[in-house]
């Protein structure tokens, strides 16, 4: 990276068009805001985070992934069927993103479409940019988190259409949790939705021996 000790950042319509030690003549008449000795840096980018795991960070460091999910994460994610709980936790999560300068992120939500919309709403209100996923799971999971395949696809379609309200900063991303928790039928249906709505896909792949075996 390049550090400019005393310099200028020029933005036009929200887009940075120049960084340097002097102001180009074309922008010489524009208003200037002096930030003194403050640091001006690009926002940080987190390309993989689980927003509903905010409250169980650092727990179960002695466990492999699958036992960790069963012991800590799945019971925590089940709580997000309650939108009030989701708003409380996601509010704290989004505030921490903002406070630490993470301005762009790619996030997992939970299987609950309405709580995932709450997360997207809070990100938009905070002025943060993100891809947000409603998680899909229809096998090899606790009963309280297993979705019916067709209902999972219907909920995802409904969520994709509702996501249009959030504009250019906060966008949906198709999110099958990982192969062990998704049937071929679900994966195929999600692929069709990704193509129909022109949205990207995120998941996990081969994170540990237990998952692969």
Model-derived regions, located:
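Short amphipathic alpha-helical segments at helix-loop
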Residues: 37, 74-78, 141-144, 175
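Metal-coordinating catalytic core of metallo-dependent amide/deamination hydrolases
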Residues: 114-213
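Histidine-rich, glycine-flanked metal-binding segment
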Residues: 1-41
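Alpha-helical scaffold segments that flank or form the walls of functional sites
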Residues: 57-128, 152-166
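Divalent metal-coordination and catalytic microenvironments
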Residues: 9, 14, 37, 48, ...
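General alpha-helical segment detector with a strong preference for membrane-spanning helices
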Residues: 50-54, 105, 208
């Amino acid at each position: 990276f390049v550090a400019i000790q005393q310099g200028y950042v020029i933005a036009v319509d929200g887009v940075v068009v120049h960084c340097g030690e002097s102001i180009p003549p074309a922008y010489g008449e524009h208003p200037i805001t002096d930030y003194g000795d403050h640091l001006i840096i690009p926002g940080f980018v987190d390309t993989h985070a689980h927003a509903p795991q905010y409250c169980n960070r650092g727990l179960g460091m002695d466990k492999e992934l699958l036992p960790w999910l069963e012991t800590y994460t799945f019971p925590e994610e089940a709580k997000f069927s309650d939108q009030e709980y989701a708003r409380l936790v996601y509010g704290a999560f989004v505030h921490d993103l903002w406070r630490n300068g993470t301005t762009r992120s790619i996030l997992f939500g939970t299987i609950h479409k309405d709580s995932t919309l709450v997360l997207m709403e809070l990100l938009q209100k905070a002025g943060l940019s993100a891809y947000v996923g409603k998680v899909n799971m229809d096998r090899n999971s606790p009963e309280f988190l297993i979705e019916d395949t067709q209902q999972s696809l219907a909920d995802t379609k409904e969520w994709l259409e509702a996501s249009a309200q959030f504009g250019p900063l906060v966008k949906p991303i198709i999110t099958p949790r990982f192969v062990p928790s998704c049937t071929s039928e679900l994966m195929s249906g999600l692929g069709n939705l990704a193509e129909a709505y022109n949205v990207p896909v995120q998941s996990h792949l081969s994170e540990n021996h237990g998952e692969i075996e």
